[in-house]
Amino acid sequence: MEHSNHKLIILSRDGVINEHRDGFVTTPDEWVAIDGSLNALAKLNQANFRVVVATNQPGIMLGKLTISNLNAIHQKMHAEVEAAGGQIEAIFFCPHSADACCTCRKPSPTMLKDIAERFDVRLDEVVYVGDTINDMHAAKAVGCHPYLVLTGQGGATYAAGELPDE
């Protein structure tokens, strides 16, 4: 598929595409799409956006989520998005917990830089949609255009009033 006229949008997963859970989404049954999110993804594709997901999954390092289950969760997400007429081109994830001090976990921008390299895009031309302050800081650090949704943790993030300046 030719993508020269397609823009890239990066979405966080939990709280943006699927319902946020206290704890972790550890099985496909626990992954529940937010009402309207699957149709929104399809509309993004119809508007010539290529959709990529960037997600922190600390449950892996903490032993609460296996790679096998993560793959099954993502297979379910892909299937539901495709059934709604959309497509996710790639999913990038960090398996580390916050105390691991890794470089791939948001708010570090490394995951976003990896996406830019793989898709050969300039991050200042990319929209990033997330629901946490870490999402906003990661996007801002590399010049993405950050958008905060009010689903998931977005309402609390907005209410805290600590968003990076535009």
Each language-model region and where it sits:
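Short, well-ordered beta-to-alpha junction loops that form the rim of enzyme active sites
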Residues: D14, N56-Q57, D131
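Generic anion/oxyanion-binding catalytic loop in active/binding sites
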Residues: T26-D29, G59, C101, Y128
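Substrate-recognition element of Asp-dependent hydrolases with the DxDx(T/V) motif
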Residues: S37, L41-H74, Q87-A100, A139
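Active-site neighborhood of HAD-like aspartate-dependent phosphohydrolases
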Residues: M1-V52
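Generic beta-structure capping elements
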Residues: D14, H20, C94-H96, G152
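Asp-based, Mg2+/Mn2+-dependent phosphohydrolase catalytic module
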Residues: E2-N5, I9, S68, A72-E89, ...
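Flexible, glycine- and charge-enriched loops at secondary-structure boundaries
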Residues: T27-I34, T66-N71, R105
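Short acidic, glycine/proline-rich loop/turn micro-motifs
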Residues: R21-V25, G63-K64, Y158-G161
